[in-house]
């Protein structure tokens, strides 16, 4: 890849070169990026995605399904992280931070919010591994927080605007400095109310 070329655009161009049309290529990149954001996968390096081919004919089938997402769901982050920490995570991926990656997503239509796991679903799934019992609540809160951020972004709100509003909420009250607290604010007032507060933040 040329050093001066955007990595996401380069990957999309590679898929197009292999016969995957531009729309399908962009939709897949948006989908993969959104899923990685939701599960806090910080290791989508260049060997962790690719193009699927027919093993007999070598004909391109399409983007390879998402695989190797092991470095996710706070896999080694044992300390409490703040909402703003999760807004600026460094990643080993097509961009160097989650914020840059998710800001490149132009459409979240491939995400059916009604089918995403609830907080209780997340805890029920991960409690099957007894070694994770100490961290279940935080894992579930983080997933819910990421889900709420995606719901807001899907309404066309820029990532930086969301980050600015969360900073404002924390500056108003230090008790808001946790993912569970931000979740409670969003869920208590509703997404529409939060979006309205974002409109107000533009004049602050």
Feature names for model-found ranges:
Residues 1-41, 46, 50-204:
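Anionic ligand-binding catalytic core segments
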């Amino acid at each position: 890849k040329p050093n001066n070329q955007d990595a996401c655009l380069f990957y999309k161009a590679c898929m197009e070169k292999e016969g995957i049309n531009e729309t399908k290529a962009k939709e897949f990149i948006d989908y993969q990026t959104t899923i990685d954001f939701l599960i806090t996968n910080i290791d989508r390096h260049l060997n962790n995605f690719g193009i699927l081919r027919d093993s007999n004919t070598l004909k391109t089938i399409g983007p390879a399904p998402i695989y190797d997402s092991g470095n996710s769901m706070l896999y080694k982050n044992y300390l409490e992280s703040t909402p703003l920490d999760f807004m600026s995570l460094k990643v080993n991926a097509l961009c160097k931070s989650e914020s840059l990656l998710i800001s490149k997503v132009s459409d979240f239509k491939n995400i059916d919010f009604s089918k995403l796991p609830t907080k209780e679903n997340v805890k029920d799934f991960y409690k099957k591994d007894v070694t994770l019992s100490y961290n279940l609540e935080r894992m579930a809160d983080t997933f819910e927080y990421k889900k709420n951020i995606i719901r807001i972004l899907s309404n066309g709100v820029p990532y930086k605007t969301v980050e600015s509003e969360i900073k404002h909420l924390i500056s108003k009250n230090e008790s808001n400095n946790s993912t569970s607290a931000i979740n409670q604010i969003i869920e208590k007032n509703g997404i529409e109310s939060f979006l309205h507060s974002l409109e107000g933040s533009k004049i602050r």
